[in-house]
Amino acid sequence: MPLLIVAIGIVALLLLIMGLKLNTFVSLIIVSFGVALALGMPLDDIVKTIEEGLGGTLGHIALIFGLGAMLGRLIADSGGAQRIAMTLVNKFGEENIQWAVVIASFIIGVALFFEVALVLLIPIVFAISKELEISISYLGIPMTAALSVTHGFLPPHPGPTAIAGELGANIGEVLLYGIIVAIPTVLLAGPLFTKLAKKIVPQSFEKMGSIASLGEQKTFKLEETPGFGISVFTAMLPVIIMSISTVITLIQETMGLADNSLLAAVRLIGNASTSMVISLLVAIYTMGIARKIPIKQVMDSCSTAITQIGMMLLIIGGGGAFKQVLINGGVGDYVAELFKGTAMSPILLAWVIAAILRISLGSATVAALSTTGLVLPMLGQSDVNLALVVLATGAGSVIASHVNDAGFWMFKEYFGLSMKETFATWTLLETIIAVAGLGFTLLLSLFV
């Protein structure tokens, strides 16, 4: 019965978002109330549960998400992202242009959120495509593959950051293992899949695409942008700090070293929130002050970034509220009881649930957060590495993007594809990322 109620709730969510065109956040809150009532939760507890879920989720990720958005905006507005992309293109040359786009997209994708990175990179990729007279899809598929993988697997992106917080996973481990899983996944879903896509829908590689909807794009002369080295360093600084801290902590645990104030300081600096604060301060200097940009202009970029993520934060909070209703309403315990004694790995189970919710709901972040509410009770009975459960959930949450996902329509319109061509490229690309991500995560679980 609880699963039937959840299924009805998901259908209702679909109808509200797609049928009635209601705002996603509002729809999530309405469905959270409805599901809570249907599950028989005490009336006095319903509002408390929704507030607990929304506040608990945002309390963990709002700082990381907000600082990450500001960091990305500074890199974009200073021309640092354009410098990274164009330098790699010039170094790799026309013959290896696809690899240049993949590497640039991966680096920029770590620092910028999916939509921001896509809007930033697409004009650059279009310009390269036009200059070299090659298909926009030939460059666009590996570009979106890299952005989608970083979005689904790597902190400080909202999905993996929020899941790690809900499951109590070490965010540094999520980042470290996420990079290990992400690199081969990008190679499969990017350059290798492009060859397959060219055979499946060759006509899509003849389309010109259009970026008119993006309006006038801010472009920089290369000499006006920050240096390549400092741009890459600034974009990757959160990754560097968290990775070093995680490696030191793993060495401490492996060697059984006694805790001390130095190791405590390393953990503090390596905490996701602290590393983002440090990285933002560095970016304010390297992308602004060091280049004689007025501090007001730098702060305007930061303010713009916060304005742009306001609704996304509310949607994440709404997903957290729905997740908490599933937990407090007993659905998570019911699922745990259902799978009690089964041989199914929590990693695989998390992926399956996230995949089903993703196909149903469209939003990767909402699917991932809702999944945590269902698998969390099971994890107490397992010794599985929580960072791997985060990665599996992230992988499942990007599967089979279709008409209920904004990314589907963005890809279709920018690259000028038909519905059939979009399904054969974008939807298949996202599915390859999900399946490859699961495969590499399961492989990694044999060693950690």
Curated annotation (Swiss-Prot):
Give the GO cellular component terms, alphabetically.
plasma membrane
What membrane topology is given?
Multi-pass membrane protein
> Which coarse location class applies to the principal site listed for this UniProt protein?
membrane
Q: Where in the cell is it found?
A: Cell membrane
The coding gene here is: gntP
Q: Please name the source species.
A: Bacillus licheniformis
Which family is it part of?
Belongs to the GntP permease family.
According to UniProt, this protein's pathway is: Carbohydrate acid metabolism; D-gluconate degradation
Cite the PANTHER family for this sequence: GNT FAMILY GLUCONATE TRANSPORTER, HIGH-AFFINITY GLUCONATE TRANSPORTER
Q: Which UniProt keywords apply?
A: Cell membrane, Gluconate utilization, Membrane, Sugar transport, Transmembrane, Transmembrane helix, Transport
- A Gene Ontology biological process annotation? D-gluconate metabolic process
The regions listed as transmembrane in this protein's record are 2-22, 23-43, 52-72, 106-126, 134-154, 174-194, 228-248, 269-289, 302-322, 347-367, 373-393, 428-448
What is this protein called in UniProt? Gluconate permease
* GO molecular function list: gluconate transmembrane transporter activity
Q: Does the keyword Transmembrane helix apply?
A: yes
